[in-house]
Regions:
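Extended, charge-enriched "interface" segments that sit outside catalytic cores
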Residues: 27-122, 129-133
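Aromatic-lined, polymer-binding surfaces characteristic
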Residues: 110-111, 117-121, 127-326, 333-341
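Beta-strand-rich N-terminal accessory domains
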Residues: 16-20, 28, 32, 36, ...
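A residue-level signal for conserved active-site and pocket-lining positions in enzyme catalytic cores
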Residues: 250, 332, 428, 569, ...
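Beta-sandwich/jelly-roll carbohydrate-recognition scaffolds of carbohydrate-active enzymes
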Residues: 98-103, 108, 414-417, 424, ...
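Carbohydrate-active enzyme catalytic cores, enriched for enzymes
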Residues: 287, 291-473, 525-530, 651
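Boundary detector for helix-to-coil junctions that initiate low-complexity/charged tails
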Residues: 1-29
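CBM-like, beta-strand-rich accessory domains located in the C-terminal region of large
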Residues: 185, 348-349, 355-361, 374-395, ...
């Protein structure tokens, strides 16, 4: 057996330890001891207390939702046939899924004690993302929606069969589905929604002695889920979106099933935690501190679901909590272009807390804005959202249609905001919300959140450009998470972003798949926005760690009348270096060179790039594998070729690279 995987694991543990405080080391040691005790039957749920079913909660999903029935009745056809789509993979699960099997690799994870099972080891669990995804049970909500809309028994029977098989195969604390509190929390949220849609405690699923026995069994697992989450919150450097998801799952669980005395105190713990983390993990300007747009929507769903559950059950969240949600929606509205495109900044794994809409053109970002428009009476959110979506209808009920329709959407100012200084993003542009819109999103934010910055990318001073709602310069996305290290490192590295690399190095040092060591510190030095131009100047110190330290400073000057963007990259050092500036184009772009001028066209929007220094040139790359270059990933585990233009230049002392971008449409 090769010792390389063992050495790699040791390196990861060492790097992880380097990012921990003394307090965290103590906490982790305590958790290890507790896991060992639990493995031998100590400090776990023994007998689950009897459930007092007289304490019934009010539903917060599905209250007279005015949705078109047919899509929801058709949606479970694949599930009934034993088929399911996991990310972009069509999977055959059969009538009874193997809940410990990774559908991508076929690996079956062992039914060992979950908290000591190494889910990062591909040889043990396969690709854990693929294993966990169906166990989140978003598809059970699809079955419950079909039953809710049709009343057909077959959907209820299928839902029960899926649940019974899961309870059979995933006993308390054993296997890969008892390793991550976040996964339990998401499953609990989807169980809650399914429970509500089938009629709650009085559902016909629970009729007769057999039904009552099944209900008791399901409730026993629900209690165990809540007990597990309460005892295994993500803390210290892991207290990111995971903690918010865990708190949300616990809160929703306690509200939905208030059948035990413990749920009263757990609900308060979860609510207090959410109130705190909502303000801590999301900047006052609305930017989620993970520095990842996908996690912005992920966290928003958790906060909204908990907030709505509390609102309907006499446990309302505070005004600052809801104000922070509104600010987060303002950020999404501001970075979204006129056609609804949102830049793929930071990590994305196609993970969702819930899947309530079966609309073909469903967009999670527009959906959130539609929900926000109704909740906060925001006409500007309505403009960005377009039509009211079904997810909003399921969450807010029939009244949402009238509220949305009656809401005035004229005389609104867009973008909502241009400057997100605390979060580190700046919106440059002109003629917003028109067919001639120019929208640039410049990044001078932190690498990520907390000491590991788990979901951040090394993208300091990068920017994206859309013209008339058509993407030109993009962030290429994420593609990989726990596996395929080469591609994981590429897509989150500096070379996969519209910025400058020095000596082939990342701005920040990778320490593991979700771990950064020495981190670049970026800052905005100048921000100006006026009628004639927008100007951004930012810098970062990521390359100061080199033997000969380098500072990278970038100025972006957008001249509105001429639709011209001048990008000046200045590198300051004492010695000599080799640098590269990369431009990543949307896969929808046709890209070509005419002499030394680079052109890109996306459905009528044409942009030219010209280097002021005549000795320099663009080199085009497309879909290169060995040294990855020229790729975009719109979905998890899916990548397609796209054009990347690379400009290589020597650096000696103070050196500047000037690129002129002209947008002709």
């Amino acid at each position: 057996m090769s010792i390389y995987p063992r050495l790699t694991a040791l390196a990861w543990y060492w790097n992880r330890l380097r990012c921990m405080s003394a307090g965290e080391v103590g906490h982790r040691a305590h958790q290890k001891v507790m896991s060992r005790l639990q493995k031998f039957g100590l400090a776990i749920v023994g007998g689950v207390p009897p459930a007092d079913l007289s304490r019934v909660a009010r539903s917060f999903v599905g209250r007279d939702s005015r949705v078109t029935r047919d899509p929801y009745i058709r949606a479970p056809a694949g599930i009934l046939a034993g088929e399911m789509k996991v990310f972009n993979l069509d999977c055959q699960f059969g009538a009874t899924p193997n809940w410990s099997r990774d559908p991508k690799t076929g690996t079956i994870a062992p039914l060992r004690f979950g908290k000591t099972l190494n889910y990062r080891d591909e040889s043990v669990v396969g690709d854990i993302k693929y294993l966990w995804e169906p166990n989140r049970h978003l598809h059970l909500v699809t079955l419950a929606q079909a039953y809710h809309q049709s009343g057909e028994q077959r959907y209820l029977d299928a839902l029960r069969h899926q649940l019974e098989s899961w309870l059979d195969q995933c006993p308390y604390l054993l296997g890969p589905n008892w390793t991550s509190s976040l996964e339990l929390a998401i499953r609990l949220i989807n169980w809650s929604i399914a429970w509500q849609l089938i009629g709650g405690v009085g559902s016909s699923m629970f009729a007769g002695p057999d039904g009552a026995q099944f209900r008791e069994r399901w409730l026993r697992s629900i209690y165990q889920h809540m007990h597990f989450i309460r005892g295994h919150f993500s803390r210290y450097s892991s207290a990111n979106n995971h903690l918010i998801g865990e708190l949300s799952g616990l809160f929703v669980g306690c509200v939905t099933w208030p059948f035990w005395p413990d749920t009263v105190k757990w609900q308060q713990v979860a609510k207090d935690g959410l109130e705190h983390e909502a303000l801590l993990q999301n900047a006052a300007d609305g930017v989620n501190r993970e520095q990842a747009i996908s996690y912005q929507q992920f966290v928003l769903d958790f906060l909204l679901l908990a907030g709505l559950a509390g609102r309907e059950n006499d446990d309302a969240f505070s005004q600052p909590y809801w104000q922070r949600i509104e600010s987060m929606l303002e950020f999404i509205a501001s970075v979204m272009d006129v056609n609804g495109n949102v830049p793929m900044i930071g990590d994305a794994d196609d993970g969702y807390a819930v899947r309530l809409s079966q609309e073909a053109e469903f967009c999670p970002y527009r959906s959130l804005l539609a929900t926000g428009a109704v909740l906060f009476k925001r006409g500007d959110f309505k403009v960005k959202a377009g039509q009211l979506d079904d997810k909003t209808r399921w969450l807010l009920g029939a009244a949402s249609d009238k509220t949305y329709a009656d809401m005035p959407a004229n005389n609104v100012t867009l973008p909502v905001r241009r400057e997100f200084r605390e979060g580190g993003y700046f919106v440059l542009g002109s003629e917003f919300e028109t067919s001639r819109e120019l929208r640039v999103i410049a990044d001078a934010g932190p690498l990520g959140y907390l000491s590991i910055a788990a979901h951040g990318h090394a993208d300091a001073l990068a920017f994206t450009l859309s013209v008339g709602g058509r993407e030109i310069l993009i962030d290429p996305g994420t593609y990989a998470y726990h596996t395929q290290k080469k591609w994981r490192d590429y897509f989150r590295g500096t070379a996969a972003h519209n910025t400058v690399t020095v000596d082939g190095e990342n701005q920040s040092e990778i320490g593991g798949n979700f771990l950064w060591l020495r981190k670049a510190n970026a800052r905005c030095e100048v921000w100006e926005s006026g009628t004639e131009h927008d100007r951004f100047v930012g810098s970062h110190d990521g390359y100061r760690r080199l033997d000969d330290p380098v500072i990278h400073r970038r100025e972006i000057l957008l001249e509105k009348a001429g639709r011209r963007i001048v990008v000046t990259d200045t590198l300051e050092c004492a010695g000599q270096h080799q640098a590269e500036c990369r431009w990543h184009f949307s896969e929808a772009c046709e890209v070509w060179l005419e002499g030394k001028v680079l052109y890109a066209r996306n459905n009528g929007s044409v942009v030219s790039l010209r280097l002021v220094e005549p000795a320099l040139k663009f080199e085009l790359h497309n879909g290169e594998e060995d040294l990855p270059c020229g790729w975009v990933s719109r979905s998890f585990d899916v990548k397609i070729p796209s054009v990347t233009a690379v400009v290589s230049f020597a650096v000696q002392g103070r050196t500047s690279l000037v690129t002129e971008i002209v947008c002709s449409y």
